[in-house]
Regions:
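Short acidic/histidine-rich motifs immediately flanking catalytic phosphotransfer sites
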Residues: 73-75
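Bacterial N-terminal signal peptides
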Residues: 2-12
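Acidic, polar ligand-binding/catalytic clefts
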Residues: 79-93, 98
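Exported/periplasmic ABC-transporter solute-binding proteins
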Residues: 17-51, 55-65, 69-71, 82-83, ...
């Protein structure tokens, strides 16, 4: 069975996995739930320009890749919060993707938090945030690291915090769940729990927290995993999922591709072209994202429509840079080797 399409713009209809090319004018997208607000804005602008609706399925990027791999969901575009999830598409991995935005981690919190004053003090630099989240009764939320990159990035941040602040065992204490309390929730539900006060704070991307109207405590480098200059410092950290897949820490990046089982690959390419173009960049920047990136994988497999846009962007403003046969995403010995290789 197929998941219900979540409305991004236009009328939500049945599952996209049964759609065939030409059946309607909608573009189906499975995207990282942290992009929910930004994708609504993208969909609105895309519709104005093309007349086409965008139907979205927001969820953790690992979970979304599994649904596509298993044929449960057949979107025209897959957008991930970590390029390392691309090999999880299996036989539907086209062997290329375009990185179009970057982000960083923060601790997001709302007015309903029981520890509002302490969090405000941490935001102002008057208290250390680990001391705040370890207070008795503090409820810190995060996403499932087996389903969502933000989940394993939170673990990386806590491990780095232990190295920066000490003492030994700090990360384990932050990750521990008090008796009868849950700390791990689906990405698409996390902000609502923070806004209502059922969680005092949670790990978010900066743009995501801003879009949801949350306050935030900034995290220092490299804990925030937002600066490409920290790639080497992050690469030594890794997380192994319950099914044995290994993900390594890397600067946060969003990437988009057209799965090989897309019913309408041209529609998918058109939406990605919009994302990496001037108008798409403007929408993303208005939503708080840092735009720019590169082609990952085999450039020869990238649709000509996209190569035209990427090349134009490189010449015009440098937002997206095209490189001949760019280096593939290295997740070895994780989901698999280069983009385009299915996991075992």
């Amino acid at each position: 069975m197929c998941p219900v399409a979540v409305l991004v713009m236009g009328v939500a209809t049945g599952a996209g996995c049964r759609r065939v090319a030409g059946e309607n004018d909608a573009v189906d997208v499975t995207y990282a739930a942290s992009l929910t607000v930004a994708m609504a804005n993208v969909a609105s602008r895309f519709r104005e320009q093309t007349g086409r609706e965008v139907r979205g399925d927001p969820r953790g990027s690992v979970a979304g890749a599994h649904l596509i791999r298993e044929g449960v969901w057949r979107p025209d575009v897959y957008i991930t919060a970590d390029p390392a999830t691309l090999p999880l598409l299996g036989d539907h991995d086209p062997g290329w993707a375009i990185v179009f935005a970057r982000g960083e981690l923060v601790l997001g919190y709302g007015d309903a938090s029981r520890h509002l004053a302490a969090l405000d003090s941490a935001k102002a630099g008057l208290l250390r945030w680990p001391d705040v989240v370890l207070r008795p009764g503090f409820r810190l939320g995060r996403t499932d690291p087996d389903l969502d990159p933000k989940g394993y990035r939170a673990i990386f941040a806590f491990r780095l915090a232990e190295e920066l602040y000490g003492p030994r065992g700090l990360a384990a204490r932050i990750l521990s769940e008090p008796s009868g309390e849950r700390s791990v929730f689906p990405e698409e539900h996390l902000s609502a729990r923070v806004l209502t006060g059922s969680l005092d704070a949670a790990v978010f991307y900066l743009a995501e927290a801003s879009q949801q109207g949350l306050r935030h405590v900034p995290l220092p480098r490299p804990l925030n995993q937002g600066d490409p200059a920290d790639a080497a410092a992050l690469a030594r950290l890794e997380y192994r999922t319950s099914d044995g897949r290994l993900f390594r820490a890397a600067p946060i990046a969003y990437a988009a591709t057209v799965p090989l089982n897309s019913p309408d690959p041209r529609a998918g390419a058109e939406l990605i072209a919009f994302l990496v173009g001037e108008d798409g960049n403007a929408v993303l920047e208005e939503s708080g994202f840092v735009t720019g990136g590169t082609v990952l994988g085999d450039v020869s497999r990238v649709p000509a429509l996209l190569l035209d846009v990427v090349a134009a962007g490189d010449v015009a403003d440098g937002r997206v840079r095209r490189s001949p046969r760019a280096a593939p995403v290295d997740t070895t010995p994780g989901p698999s080797g280069p983009t385009g290789s299915p996991p075992p």
